[in-house]
Amino acid sequence: MMLPDWKIRKEILIEPFSEESLQPAGYDLRVGGEAYVNGKILDVKDSGGVTIPPKTYALVLTLERIKLPDDVMGDMKLRSSLAREGLIGSFAWVDPGWDGNLTLALFNASNESVELKYGERFVQIAFIRLEGPAKNPYRGNYQGSKHLALSKRKR
């Protein structure tokens, strides 16, 4: 079962919470303070945004910290306006028990640069209730992330 707006407000910890981001069946996550483009970590908050050049992969941190109960998971989709500009998002499930900011992977498939402004809504997350709590909720490598998290596979 997907959670409606009033249950999201009541049951899911989202910090900082924005009423404008709350949707009927989801929540619009905003561009946070860090990004990774062309091998460099960028301060998005200080610069006011991040530019993703054509044919370039990027990681973008969400402004929001999300904390999920052990019986709720998240499914994310890129906002359609950004897809129409050429962005493609590759997002994993957000497992039950997750707590932290999310690092999201984007690819600019277009021939034009795409700019994301700090605080701009860019991905919607929908929350899905499981039949019961997970026996093994998420407690993995990225739990508690507050900053951009690069892959831990290459370490």
Swiss-Prot record:
Superkingdom field: Archaea
Signal peptide interval: none
EC class name: hydrolase
Gene3D superfamilies reported in the protein's UniProt record: 2.70.40.10
Gene Ontology MF term list: dCTP deaminase activity; nucleotide binding
Record pathway: Pyrimidine metabolism; dUMP biosynthesis; dUMP from dCTP (dUTP route): step 1/2
Keywords in alphabetical order: Hydrolase, Nucleotide metabolism, Nucleotide-binding
EC identifiers of the protein: 3.5.4.13
Alphabetized InterPro entries for the sequence: dCTP_deaminase, dUTPase-like_sf, dUTPase_trimeric
GO process annotations (BP): dUMP biosynthetic process; dUTP biosynthetic process
Keyword Metal-binding part of the UniProt annotation: no
Binding site for dCTP: 79-84, 95, 124, 138
Reactions accelerated catalytically: dCTP + H2O + H(+) = dUTP + NH4(+)
CDD domains (alphabetical): trimeric_dUTPase
Role played: Catalyzes the deamination of dCTP to dUTP.
Subunit description: Homotrimer.
Family: Belongs to the dCTP deaminase family.
Descriptive protein name: dCTP deaminase
Organism from which the protein derives: Thermococcus kodakarensis (strain ATCC BAA-918 / JCM 12380 / KOD1) (Pyrococcus kodakaraensis (strain KOD1))
